[in-house]
């Protein structure tokens, strides 16, 4: 048994089998992968890594597993390995089809894990069992650790949550033959604090304008090297931050040179959530990486400079789905918490589309009618609003109950994962209206939008 001192959780105990994993080459790589990408350019002390976050996630996950009588050993080792496939600078470089989950599974298959079942670990990381929901779910160990850790290392107080009370409030219940994780009614305030913490951390840290600009620049720097065949997307799975930065410097990548000097691009134009109509939002959130790069090529043709477009991912708001257990039965957090409901519009307000240009060209571009010219290019996008869920609502008019909606969708060949992802996007964009009535959700098309 060995004790590791952690800045967040203090003493973390590890047994010999876990130490073997930590001492592996694959896990040691995480020591040099920053947890929050290029956030250190704004918050200088944000130099913490995926290494300590993985330890922290294991610590919290094991506490939850003990509380709900899950497999503690499987939970701990799976939590340790949950980020093993991350590329340099973490989520920032999940580009060109790179998925840290996919590469993580590949690494696990090739690691020396004789003391554990690789298939069970992969099953857990795919959220196919209770242990997987502990690590990554509606209220999970991963999220709780990164909020506490990122808050501490950025020097902000926004991510502070009542971890002990959340852990005391976690329980399980059975629904349709499956064991699910929920929160006792006495823990509502603690879960609400988690919602607020996440919202504030996204606003102040993860979506900080300068952080987003730096992240976009490093993405484009790496994409350029991949396009020129100097780098393969698979290489990222074995590189850390140091290796990648060294490669970009040797390649004399001009964007890396600018990042090194903190000579960052500046915000040229911002489109907020409320600047765009539902169809425009739908078009933008469905643009893939290839289409975005094509747009940027059009900008270059028009202006003669690299101008980047940054479309922030739709907020997932998973915590709103947390089950609250009381004497009255099981309800979702949204049903019992006015605060949770009020945060949904605030989450939407955070979302925007930003267009960046070299700071030395901002004045010149603005003097040359840049916004109208960019708007003209954006209007050339030919993306149709196509959705099987919209087709279903055109046929049914109104559907009462999310489960009923899912059943109809499954009959049309739509998987549950596709259903939930598509529904979330459609509601976010304002193409489908969701309202809560008499303890159930009701869905219909937004009649103010012509489809």
From Swiss-Prot:
Domain HD: 50-147
SMART domains per record: HDc
InterPro entries assigned: dGTPase-like, HD/PDEase_dom, HD_assoc_2, HD_domain, HDIG_dom
GO molecular function: dGTPase activity
Biological process terms in GO annotation: dGTP catabolic process
PANTHER family associated with the record: DEOXYNUCLEOSIDE TRIPHOSPHATE TRIPHOSPHOHYDROLASE, DEOXYNUCLEOSIDE TRIPHOSPHATE TRIPHOSPHOHYDROLASE SAMHD1
NCBIfam families according to UniProt: HDIG (TIGR00277)
Protein name according to UniProt: Uncharacterized protein MJ1154
Organism: Methanocaldococcus jannaschii (strain ATCC 43067 / DSM 2661 / JAL-1 / JCM 10045 / NBRC 100440)
